[in-house]
Amino acid sequence: MENKNDMFNKTPKSGKPKMFRFNLYWMYGLIFIMLVALYMTNDSSGTKELGWTEFQKLAQENVFDKMTVYNKKNLVEATVKNGKTEQVFGNMDVSKIGVSPKVYVKIPSADKFSDFYDKAVADSHIDTQVRFEEGDDAIWNFLVSFGPIILLIGVWMFLMRRMSGGTGAGPGGVFSVGKAKAQLFDKDNDRKVTFKDVAGLAEAKQEVEEIVSFLKNPEKYTELGGKIPKGALLVGPPGTGKTLLAKAVAGEANVPFFSLSGSDFVEMFVGVGASRVRDLFRQAKEKSPCIVFIDEIDAVGRARGKNANMNSNDERENTLNQLLTEMDGFGSNSGVIILAATNRADILDKALLRAGRFDRQIHVELPDLNERKEIFGVHLRPIKIDESVDAEFLARQTPGFSGADIANVCNEAALIAARNGKKFVQKEDFMNAVDRIVGGLEKRSKITTEEERKCIANHEAGHATLSWLLEHANPLVKVTIVPRGKALGAAWYLPEERQITTREQLQDEMCATLGGRAAEELVLGKISTGASNDLERVTKQAYAMVVYFGMSDKLPNLNYYDSTGQDWGFTKPYSEETAKLIDTEVQKIINEQYDRAKRILSENKEGHSKLAQVLLDREVIYSEDVEHIFGKRAWISRSQEILELQEKANGKNKENADKEAEADATTENVTDTPTEENKTGKIA
């Protein structure tokens, strides 16, 4: 039965004869034949055949320097002495005679030659050297003559094979530099990643699963007039699972899957990128229907005319133009689906993003609480854990973590448990792994003085105090004065995963961040460089409030952000006067929050001092210790609110499910109740 969907029918083979295609192995064979012919038809200039009588006469005149007698061939090879060539060759041109001219003589036998030579030595006192050999080995002579050349050719072939080994284009060496480097996965490949291995990303998985479903069952969509998307672009931060999603597509789709990186198109040779694009789509058309996955497409898809090097004829632009033509030009790419991934969609060329090339943009964002729980469930499968490990608890402790970060946490926890000689990975190991990733390696060996420890303790206690007393500050988890990474102390928070952020929330976060510097000034009467990172974060946040969010009193409702990313920092969308006003507003916002931080710390001086002393004594404190000093927080965090709403929803779903189960059970009981006729054995 003929397939309804013509786009999935492979192109029929043309009746035209195939064009002649050059094979590099033919060149190797041609060189070998030429060498053999050169050896067999060796130029005889500089050599001469003599008769036995003439040879005897010349030998007695001491014309020859040395002779070689081949016993089996009854042949003598004699080399003429310098200055004696005229006696042998007459008036022949010197250039044809050569440097060491030779003569060849057919002798009656080796014994007769020996008799002649002995007599000539006795009578004429000749000094010619004579050597006897069994015979002339043609193969050996050939190897001696052309062995070095053959060796060079062999080395050259080996190097060319090595150079072309990574291109996937077979032999050809530098001649295959324009071939695509795509890796091909088909049904014969051993694939391990499926959609079951991709936790979270429900919406993104649905989009790509639809593409796979279309490839498996195209009639379901084509009967309604639908067409498969020509391309899908996966967009999202690093580590969120874009490439993993593509691997799952390769594992699920029963069609060939080409995979390569955007940088594979770029080469030092001009024109190679465009050639590789053409070759990639040629291979894809031959195996259609198929999927082509281009990872990090921003390496080749950057917007034209906006390159930082200001090169008007950039090689990358030529490659992009060819890619645009192949994706949706006059040629037909029926059955070839393009899947690409990038974390810089803002710099991609607009022509690349339009419908007809990438019909779908699938946003792969950082996982939320439920998605992190699912991701932990996947990565905890191969790890031996005890009953203390709870995926939901770990998900709450890792806000803002990507899928790659969560995989790293699980691996670090297993390594920490193995380092400590444990048989199972415990909750404590996971918490240490989170601390290791967020704060860096713990450095208890770093020596600090008593004055430095006091300064660090007051600094961290200032952060903890303000984060506890401010409504919109991130909830505190842990504070330590043990050096980690580059920091001498650190505080861990559970960032609120907000969908929108208000001015008050930003101000509370800035105030809590400035709490360390404010505590140093209030308690110690001096400030240190320990707050440099805090000041950097606060400055960026205040600048964003003024320039991007329009939260300034003197510059309200204005946004100076260029979302296209094409200005390259060469221009500013505001005047010098406005720039000065921006600096003034940023300074004003920071000063207000710094004064606010000092005021709150002054009002809670006793609690701050107790917290700093506990830090000095124990080095590490948790939210329970802060709660013991300041009391329970008066506000509920957004994460806790979401958890409570989710628990209520789960409770309602469970209650509804129980009611449905009871109703089904009641219906079954009514249906199965026997009638009076059935009881007496009659047919109802």
Curated annotation (Swiss-Prot):
<comment type="subunit">
    <text>Homohexamer.</text>
</comment>
<dbReference type="GO" id="GO:0016887">
    <property type="term" value="F:ATP hydrolysis activity"/>
</dbReference>
<dbReference type="InterPro" id="IPR041569">
    <property type="entry name" value="AAA_lid_3"/>
</dbReference>
<keyword id="KW-0479">Metal-binding</keyword>
<dbReference type="Pfam" id="PF17862">
    <property type="entry name" value="AAA_lid_3"/>
</dbReference>
<feature type="transmembrane region" description="Helical">
    <location>
        <begin position="22"/>
        <end position="42"/>
    </location>
</feature>
<dbReference type="InterPro" id="IPR005936">
    <property type="entry name" value="FtsH"/>
</dbReference>
<feature type="topological domain" description="Periplasmic">
    <location>
        <begin position="43"/>
        <end position="138"/>
    </location>
</feature>
<dbReference type="InterPro" id="IPR003959">
    <property type="entry name" value="ATPase_AAA_core"/>
</dbReference>
<keyword id="KW-0645">Protease</keyword>
<dbReference type="GO" id="GO:0006508">
    <property type="term" value="P:proteolysis"/>
</dbReference>
<feature type="binding site">
    <location>
        <position position="463"/>
    </location>
    <ligand>
        <name>Zn(2+)</name>
    </ligand>
</feature>
<keyword id="KW-0997">Cell inner membrane</keyword>
<comment type="similarity">
    <text>In the central section; belongs to the AAA ATPase family.</text>
</comment>
<feature type="topological domain" description="Cytoplasmic">
    <location>
        <begin position="160"/>
        <end position="684"/>
    </location>
</feature>
<feature type="topological domain" description="Cytoplasmic">
    <location>
        <begin position="1"/>
        <end position="21"/>
    </location>
</feature>
<feature type="transmembrane region" description="Helical">
    <location>
        <begin position="139"/>
        <end position="159"/>
    </location>
</feature>
<dbReference type="InterPro" id="IPR003593">
    <property type="entry name" value="AAA+_ATPase"/>
</dbReference>
<keyword id="KW-0862">Zinc</keyword>
<dbReference type="InterPro" id="IPR003960">
    <property type="entry name" value="ATPase_AAA_CS"/>
</dbReference>
<dbReference type="InterPro" id="IPR027417">
    <property type="entry name" value="P-loop_NTPase"/>
</dbReference>
<keyword id="KW-0482">Metalloprotease</keyword>
<dbReference type="GO" id="GO:0004176">
    <property type="term" value="F:ATP-dependent peptidase activity"/>
</dbReference>
<keyword id="KW-0378">Hydrolase</keyword>
<feature type="binding site">
    <location>
        <begin position="236"/>
        <end position="243"/>
    </location>
    <ligand>
        <name>ATP</name>
    </ligand>
</feature>
<dbReference type="GO" id="GO:0004222">
    <property type="term" value="F:metalloendopeptidase activity"/>
</dbReference>
<dbReference type="Pfam" id="PF06480">
    <property type="entry name" value="FtsH_ext"/>
</dbReference>
<keyword id="KW-0067">ATP-binding</keyword>
<dbReference type="GO" id="GO:0005524">
    <property type="term" value="F:ATP binding"/>
</dbReference>
<dbReference type="InterPro" id="IPR018247">
    <property type="entry name" value="EF_Hand_1_Ca_BS"/>
</dbReference>
<dbReference type="InterPro" id="IPR011546">
    <property type="entry name" value="Pept_M41_FtsH_extracell"/>
</dbReference>
<keyword id="KW-0547">Nucleotide-binding</keyword>
<protein>
    <recommendedName>
        <fullName>ATP-dependent zinc metalloprotease FtsH</fullName>
        <ecNumber>3.4.24.-</ecNumber>
    </recommendedName>
</protein>
<keyword id="KW-1133">Transmembrane helix</keyword>
<keyword id="KW-0472">Membrane</keyword>
<feature type="active site">
    <location>
        <position position="460"/>
    </location>
</feature>
<comment type="similarity">
    <text>In the C-terminal section; belongs to the peptidase M41 family.</text>
</comment>
<feature type="binding site">
    <location>
        <position position="534"/>
    </location>
    <ligand>
        <name>Zn(2+)</name>
    </ligand>
</feature>
<dbReference type="InterPro" id="IPR050928">
    <property type="entry name" value="ATP-dep_Zn_Metalloprotease"/>
</dbReference>
<keyword id="KW-0812">Transmembrane</keyword>
<feature type="region of interest" description="Disordered">
    <location>
        <begin position="647"/>
        <end position="684"/>
    </location>
</feature>
<dbReference type="GO" id="GO:0030163">
    <property type="term" value="P:protein catabolic process"/>
</dbReference>
